[in-house]
Amino acid sequence: MNILPISAFFLLYLGHSLAQENVCNLPVDEGVCRALFKRFYYEPATDSCKEFYYGGCEGNGNRFKSKKECILKCQKNKQLIKTRKRKPKKTTKPPIPIISLD
């Protein structure tokens, strides 16, 4: 049995996994272009996701379209995700007043 293909696959998988984990430790990078896309980056020192403006090209992987995406990917204390509570929909119409002429 040739173990080389299995070893190569394992090393590629391991490298990919480590690269995925390390994006959270990269510094914020606005990129070199001048667009203003609102994005979020993870700041390890405060274990929080913060807003910044991305220029639209280059930069690094520590860039998320939403704060929730950043939190789910990087933040250690994930309980800080706030869920919006929906107000219950009114499904009944208000009662129609009945006038009695007795």
Swiss-Prot record:
GO CC terms: extracellular space
Which keywords has UniProt assigned to this entry?
A: Disulfide bond, Protease inhibitor, Secreted, Serine protease inhibitor, Signal
Q: What is the effect of changing R34A?
A: Significantly reduces anti-coagulation activity
InterPro entries, per the entry: Kunitz_BPTI, Kunitz_BPTI_sf, Prtase_inh_Kunz-CS, TFPI/VKTCI-like
Endpoints of the signal sequence: 1-19
Q: What is the effect of changing K38A?
A: Does not affect anti-coagulation activity
MF term (GO), any: serine-type endopeptidase inhibitor activity
Does this UniProt record's set of keywords contain Signal?
Answer: yes
- The answer to keyword Ribonucleoprotein applying to this record is no
Q: Which SMART domains match?
A: KU (SM00131)
Instruction: Give the UniProt subcellular location, in the record's own words.
Output: Secreted
Q: Where is this region: Disordered?
A: 83-102
Q: What is its main location?
A: secreted
Expression across tissues: Salivary gland (at protein level). Not detected in female carcass without head and salivary glands. Not detected in males.
Disulfide-bonded cysteine pairs: these are: C24-C74, C33-C57, C49-C70
- Induction of synthesis: Constitutively expressed in female salivary gland; blood feeding does not affect expression.
Q: How does it assemble?
A: Interacts with mouse, bovine and human coagulation factor X (F10) (activated). Interacts with host elastase.
Q: What task does this protein carry out?
A: Salivary anticoagulant that inhibits plasma clotting in the host. Strongly inhibits host elastase, coagulation factors Xa (F10) and cathepsin G (CTSG). Inhibits host plasmin (PLG), kallikrein, trypsin, beta-tryptase and coagulation factor XIa (F11).
The entry sums up its family as follows:
Belongs to the venom Kunitz-type family.
Name used for this protein in its record: Simukunin
